[in-house]
Regions:
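Alpha-helical interface subdomain recognition
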Residues: 1-118
Length: 118
């Protein structure tokens, strides 16, 4: 979208703020992918722990929300239209939060596992 949307005579992807948002989205996605694969690999080997799993779930949950928010900022008004997939991703993120717990819940699980949460 950022490459195709033109504002002030040039694609919005040429603006530094948009570039930073897109770069941050990539960092969140790649970080989530890494921690998910690492945790899955450790689980497959039987070397995972409750803390590692909760950490991965918490990171991915928070990253998903941030990527959605940045996507809405990059997309502007178009991002809230049902014709764009971002609205579907927003609904899925909320449903996943309800079904699997949000980042705050998973931070609480980590703290409890460390013995620092009541």
């Amino acid at each position: 979208y950022a490459k195709n949307r033109v504002q002030f005579g040039k694609p919005i992807a040429s603006f530094q703020a948009i570039q930073h948002h897109c770069a941050n989205m990539l960092l969140y996605v790649e970080g989530s992918r890494h921690i998910t694969y690492k945790t899955a690999c450790l689980m497959d080997e039987g070397r995972s722990s409750k803390i590692r799993i909760a950490t991965a779930k918490g990171w991915v949950s928070e990253a998903y929300k941030r990527v959605i928010a940045l996507g809405h900022q990059v997309g502007g008004g178009a991002a809230i239209m049902t014709e764009h997939d971002l609205t579907l991703y927003s609904r899925r993120a909320k449903a996943a939060e309800v079904a699997f717990g949000d980042a705050a819940y998973h931070r609480m699980v980590v703290a409890s596992s460390l013995g620092i949460h009541e």
